[in-house]
Amino acid sequence: MSAPDDLWARLARLTPARIGLGRAGSGLPTREVLRFGLAHAQARDAVHTPMEAEAIARSVEALGLATRVVASQAPDRATYLRRPDYGRRLAPESADALARAAGAPVDLAILIADGLSARAVHEGAAPLIAAFQPHIAAAGWNLAPVVIAAQARVALGDAVGSILRARAVAVLIGERPGLSSPDSLGIYLTFGPRPGRSDAERNCISNVRPAGLSPAEAAFKLNWLLREALSRGLTGVNLKDESERFLAAPGAARALPGAES
């Protein structure tokens, strides 16, 4: 192997991105053509695979949390993909059911939404919530039942949080899959959720997956953002994620649950 080839091989081991693919004549090696086809199929599957809401509910309930399963106004996947606006609104019967279940005001509502990758929420939602629970306990925050929604967009959390009288809502949603990331989970935090909030009023934690941000790291960031959001009364472009500064401070490693002092 030549020096440039060896360099590309070493770089390729550090990222799932499609780099250093090599050549076979004027085209790509057969191995890379097959890998591309597999990645494309995995991305399509991530978008079109139905979310197993009941299975997710069981995994969340195993953590000791109550759940509610709801639906958006998109009746099926085809409509959801063609009409994003339907995915941002609760079905009337789901809105009524949540309203009946709403209790006293809470600090946080959590919505698990399939988004564009059911695989991401199947694999990542419960581990993220489990990693976040020690932060919840330490801060003394009270939670609404975890809501699970099919055919859902980020903005559906605004209605959910408003109905449940939450000071903030965190939407755990499957992100649009790429050719190397069909399993990426995103977290969108919004203070004062209500219909009509814009994306500029949200904070996003992206790329939560085995090859990206770990559940523990994502939970740490969410804890920092939520604490600051509740203190300052805002989220979005006016709230910058400075959790890394806190983590770099002396003794900050103890802020990660399970970290040794």
Where in this protein do the model-derived segments appear?
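C-terminal functional extensions of proteins
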Residues: E175-S184, Y188-S261
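Conserved active-site and cofactor/substrate-binding residues in soluble primary-metabolism enzymes
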Residues: M51, L65, E123, P127, ...
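Solvent-exposed alpha-helices and their adjacent loops that cap or buttress functional pockets
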Residues: V60-A62, R100-A104, G161-R165, L179-S181, ...
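A contiguous pocket-lining binding segment that forms or flanks enzyme active sites
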Residues: P134-P182
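Gly/Ser/Thr-rich loops at beta-strand to alpha-helix junctions
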Residues: D76, G115-A120, A152-R153, R176-L179
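Short glycine-rich or small-residue beta-strand-to-loop segments that form or flank ligand, phosphate
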Residues: D107-A120, A170-L172, S206
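Glycine-rich phosphate/diphosphate-binding loop of Rossmann-like nucleotide-binding domains
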Residues: A118-G140
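Active-site loop/lid in soluble adenylation, ligation, and acyl-transfer enzymes
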Residues: M1-D85, A95, R245-A248
